[in-house]
């Protein structure tokens, strides 16, 4: 009885373990069109550089984000986490270009509307998600 339980537990653990295959496209082979599909209709593709910002405690833009070590800029981006982000234009001619050729750093999906959080007890706006975390 215990042997059967041990074998059943082992089989369940092996089948539940994540595989090395992501199921989706590799980030290095992803085109701008595929990245745009991953982002969705209400988001745009941004290329985020290394973290070059510094936290200024006297700035009005640092609220709770400043306490957590992230500066929320005027555009609503968490600059400390993703760095300085610039929008990658996706037009008809560039849809087939590889994402890696357009952005050698971190690519992210960001909301088109400015992310602003006001009037609540905890005001935290998270407008961007790294594209690498969307690939499964």
UniProtKB/Swiss-Prot annotation:
Highest taxon of the lineage: Eukaryota
Keywords noted in UniProt: Cell wall, Cytoplasmic vesicle, Disulfide bond, Secreted, Signal, Vacuole
Subcellular location: Secreted; Secreted, Cell wall; Spore coat; Vacuole
Entry GO terms, CC: extracellular region; fungal-type cell wall
Main location: secreted
Gene inactivation effect: Leads to complete ablation of slender rodlets on conidial coat. Significantly reduces conidial hydrophobicity, adhesion to insect cuticle, virulence via normal cuticle infection and dispersal potential. Does not affect radial growth and multiple stress responses. Impairs significantly conidial tolerance to a wet-heat stress at 45 degrees Celsius.
Signal peptide: 1-16
Pfam family, one: Hydrophobin
Protein name listed in UniProt: Class I hydrophobin A
Species: Beauveria bassiana (strain ARSEF 2860)
